[in-house]
């Protein structure tokens, strides 16, 4: 009896591990389950809605999501930009492309959403731009060269355009300290890639979600600020 329980527990651990390993690149049956978990876990839904609200997307905005998963944030963004804006998304998982396309079928048919299978280090030329806003939720840790890729994304942002990067550490034993450290690392990456930091927000989940907001510097606004700044007395 004890041996049967141990075998059952071992199988359960193996199944859970297989699903967890799928979150970076969902595929096959386990990937389908991972997509279902991402779409239906209440904390994920709350997290995505919160990040979109922080980005303050406006009607007519052109918005890009990197790593859209099952398409929850894409759906929220499409509602916010309305008929005059457009939402783009890339994800390197064919499974997530199918799930997100089904979830956003009406917006895609209406020409308001465009989803593409592509990794962040191979942005397709057809992606368009410049964008008013870019966001990514829990995908940065899978990027191979984050500073370089953030710099490439910044070049797709209009001057003054903003980016939101959210992280909710899912490693075993993650705490508020883990989230805080993740925020500091993301802030450093953004500054190294040429962004101007705006602010960092925290959502009180377990573990906490951090969202770092930054902007692509606007050269004209910077020049105006420098002209208006008081000159030191000679």
What are these regions, as identified by a protein language model?
Residues 42-61:
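Conserved alpha-helix/loop element of class I SAM-dependent methyltransferases that forms part
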Residues 64-122:
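Class I SAM-dependent methyltransferase SAM/SAH-binding core
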Residues 121-134:
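A short acidic, Gly/Pro-enriched loop at the edge of an enzyme's catalytic core
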Residues 133-146:
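A short SAM/SAH-binding and catalytic strip from SAM-dependent methyltransferases
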Residues 147-159:
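A short glycine-rich, Lys/Arg-flanked "PGG" loop and its adjoining helix->strand segment in the class I
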Residues 160-168:
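Conserved beta-strand signature within the Rossmann-like core of class I S-adenosyl-L-methionine
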Residues 178-193:
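Short alpha-helix
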Residues 204-234:
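Core SAM-dependent methyltransferase catalytic element
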């Amino acid at each position: 009896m004890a041996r049967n329980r141990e075998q059952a527990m071992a199988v359960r651990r193996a199944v859970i591990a297989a699903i967890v390993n799928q979150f970076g690149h969902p595929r096959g049956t386990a990937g389908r389950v991972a997509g279902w978990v991402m779409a239906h876990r209440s904390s994920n839904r709350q997290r995505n809605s919160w990040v979109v609200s922080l980005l303050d997307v406006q009607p007519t905005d052109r918005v890009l999501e990197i790593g859209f998963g099952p398409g929850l944030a894409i759906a929220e963004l499409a509602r916010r930009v309305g008929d005059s804006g457009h939402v783009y998304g890339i994800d390197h998982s064919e499974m997530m492309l199918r799930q997100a396309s089904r979830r956003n079928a009406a917006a895609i048919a209406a020409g308001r959403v465009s989803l593409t299978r592509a990794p962040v280090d191979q942005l397709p030329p057809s992606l368009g731009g410049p964008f008013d806003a870019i966001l990514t939720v829990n995908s940065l840790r899978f990027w191979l060269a984050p500073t370089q890729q953030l710099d490439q994304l910044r070049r797709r942002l209009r001057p003054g355009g903003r980016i939101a990067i959210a992280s909710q550490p899912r490693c075993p034993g993650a705490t508020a300290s883990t989230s805080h450290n993740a925020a500091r690392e993301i802030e450093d990456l953004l500054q190294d890639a040429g962004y101007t930091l705006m602010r960092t927000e925290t959502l009180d989940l377990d573990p906490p979600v951090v969202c770092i907001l930054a902007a692509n510097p606007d050269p004209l606004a910077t020049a105006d600020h420098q002209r208006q700044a008081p000159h030191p007395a000679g």
